[in-house]
Regions:
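Amphipathic alpha-helical interaction segments
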Residues: 39, 56, 289-293
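Active-site- or DNA-interface-adjacent structural scaffold in DNA-acting proteins
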Residues: 27-30, 44-100, 154-155, 168
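Short, charged amphipathic recognition helices of the HTH superfamily
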Residues: 32-42
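Single, function-defining residue in the core of a domain
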Residues: 1-34, 71-73, 87-90, 101, ...
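Short beta-strand scaffold segments in enzyme catalytic cores
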Residues: 105-109
Length: 379
């Protein structure tokens, strides 16, 4: 349920009772797929009163040593070392998600068409983040990823040339999408990016141009591309990417990876753990996100292992042969494997009876039981 190499990290910072409670909570998250405290307390398998379980959960989320630096980063650093060699290129996406009065700024590393959260902060305001908030969180991540080549990806909220200049000073690569009305100076003439004349299927690379009419930022490269119509779909507008890469292809290919963090947010919300249903704020929410991050990465790794074994067809609908995009992510496979195994354990006697009634299908059932054993070994 929790990787063995992570057990030692947690046991160094948690008491044995706290460690066991965390393991229970991760297991509950994988099966109920809901982070509302009442729903977690309902499913928490402790033989005490419901209200006692709820208060126990609240006290756990109030425990200060449960934080990113001590209980998350050691395992994440180990995982990154396992999946990327030293000096490898790591794509990290900076993005913000919000609902109600909650506003979260997060940086994640791109992995397997999804993203792993590295660091996050709760903004005490509504709306966009500012440069100070962006550079503060990015500096922590850049220092954490020392020894790797970091590429920072950001959408139009993070379009500021000030951020681009700061990233240049940190000696990291970046791809920051620009708004269409951003001004660039080309051949001594100022133009808005949308006035460059791009049409679907066209691309353009502006080398070392001034971006915005404000002074003191130096020059940047701007990669421009408007994707052609494909399968009846055409983007409404072109992409304009502020970057320190030297080609359109490299810039666009890198920026496309940014959408993996949006898939991750979808997994954390309605596609997985229903984060928006959480009725907690402040430090409790911060630590709840930490629990979700542990559960999310754990399920993703388990799903990847199940896919490598070729057993995903026992957990979810099989992929179509001619379909270019995957139907299910490794996270989806891992999360739903927990549900399948859990139901088998709860209904084992009934299933055994059904198998005896349908004896002509016993060879298929035996294959399924073997698959169940192998899948259980990954969880």
């Amino acid at each position: 349920m929790i990787a063995k190499e992570y057990e030692s990290v947690l046991k160094n910072h948690l008491s044995h009772a706290q460690y066991l409670l965390l393991v229970l909570l991760i297991g509950v998250l994988q099966t109920v797929k809901d982070v509302k405290l009442e729903h977690i307390a309902e499913a928490l398998p402790l033989p005490i009163l419901f209200e006692s379980r709820r208060r126990k959960l609240q006290r756990f989320l109030d425990w200060q040593p449960l934080n990113i630096e001590t209980c998350w980063w050691p395992w994440l650093k180990s995982l990154i070392a396992q999946h990327w060699p030293p000096k490898a290129v790591l794509y990290v996406a900076l993005d913000r998600t919000s609902w109600s009065c909650i506003n979260i700024l997060m940086v994640s590393v791109i992995w397997n068409h999804r993203a792993w959260p590295i660091y996050w902060t709760l903004l005490d305001k509504k709306g966009s983040s500012n440069l100070a908030e962006q550079t503060t969180i990015l500096l922590k991540v850049i220092q954490f990823l020392e020894g790797y080549k970091v590429v920072v990806l950001g959408d139009r909220e993070f379009c500021s040339p000030k951020l681009g200049k700061w990233l240049c000073e940190q000696k990291v690569y970046f791809c920051l999408r620009q708004k269409q009305n951003t001004n660039v100076q080309q051949d001594s003439v100022w133009l808005e990016l949308r006035e460059l004349g791009l049409t679907p299927g066209m691309s353009l690379f502006l080398n070392e141009v001034n971006v915005t009419k404000q002074q003191g930022f130096g020059t940047f490269n701007v990669a421009c591309k408007w994707k052609r119509k494909y399968r009846g779909f055409a983007p409404d507008e072109a992409w304009y990417i502020l970057t320190n890469f030297t080609s359109v292809e490299e810039s666009i290919k890198s920026y496309q990876k940014r959408f993996c963090i949006e898939e991750m947010f979808r997994d954390l919300k309605e596609g997985g753990y229903s984060l928006e249903a959480a009725k907690v704020e402040g430090d409790r929410l911060h630590r709840l996100i930490l629990l979700i991050a542990i559960a999310y990465v754990t399920a993703s790794l388990e799903g990847k292992t199940i896919q490598k074994m070729g057993l995903q067809k026992y957990v979810a609908r099989p992929e179509k042969e001619k379909k270019q995009t995957r139907r299910h992510s490794s996270f989806y496979i891992g999360l739903h494997a927990h549900r399948w195994v859990s139901q088998w354990q709860n209904q084992q006697e009934i299933v055994q009876e059904i198998m005896q009634i349908n004896r002509h299908k016993l060879p298929y059932y035996r294959k399924g039981l073997r698959a169940m054993e192998l899948i259980q070994s990954t969880l």
